[in-house]
UniProtKB/Swiss-Prot annotation:
The keyword Glycosyltransferase does not apply. Residues 1-18 form the signal peptide. Glycans are attached at N26, N114, N150. Residues 119-123 are annotated as: Interaction with lipopolysaccharide. The gene is Ly96. One of its GO terms (cellular component) is extracellular region. Binds bacterial lipopolysaccharide (LPS). Cooperates with TLR4 in the innate immune response to bacterial lipopolysaccharide (LPS), and with TLR2 in the response to cell wall components from Gram-positive and Gram-negative bacteria. Enhances TLR4-dependent activation of NF-kappa-B. Cells expressing both LY96 and TLR4, but not TLR4 alone, respond to LPS. This is Lymphocyte antigen 96. It comes from Mus musculus.
Length: 160
């Protein structure tokens, strides 16, 4: 009986289910997916129109979620790696509390946020490889973590 308990205890971390990838889009030059990177697993819906290509596309990323706190102040901590090389942490402030560019700024706790954010990769050349971006959304005066998402981008073609 002791070997069975020892064996099952040692292998349980190995046999647990890996973090489920949420499909985001699959284009001619990139596969993009995301998963949760914290235990909160906050319900969020992300899609793009058109599917993101890293070769000069532009469009909109659609985001829908219900914030657990007021969005008067909102910023993202971005941790990015390219082919396993870590880049410096980046802090991207979206909602300053005044003269904000985005309609969802000042949304209150419990209100549905449904927004479209424009993107463009015109003139940017991405080398092929494996990109990872962890995005932590931090909101409010108390700097509460709203959610954490781990984006994976596999760029299949070298455009240089």
């Amino acid at each position: 009986m002791l070997p069975f308990i020892l064996f099952s205890t040692l292998l349980s971390p190995i046999l647990t289910e890996s973090e489920k990838q949420q499909w985001f889009c699959n284009s001619s030059d990139a596969i993009i997916s995301y998963s949760y990177c914290d235990h909160l697993k906050f319900p969020i819906s992300i899609s793009s129109e058109p599917c993101i290509r890293l070769r000069g596309t532009n469009g909109f990323v659609h985001v829908e979620f219900i914030p657990r706190g007021n969005l008067k102040y909102l910023y993202f901590n971005l941790f990015i790696s390219v082919n396993s090389i870590e880049l410096p942490k980046r802090k991207e402030v979206l909602c300053h509390g005044h003269d904000d560019d985005y309609s969802f700024c000042r949304a209150l706790k419990g209100e549905t946020v449904n927004t479209s954010i424009p993107f463009s990769f015109e003139g940017i050349l991405f080398p092929k490889g494996h990109y990872r971006c962890v995005a932590e959304a931090i909101a409010g005066d108390t700097e509460e973590k709203l959610f954490c998402l781990n984006f994976t981008i596999i760029h299949r073609r070298d455009v240089n």
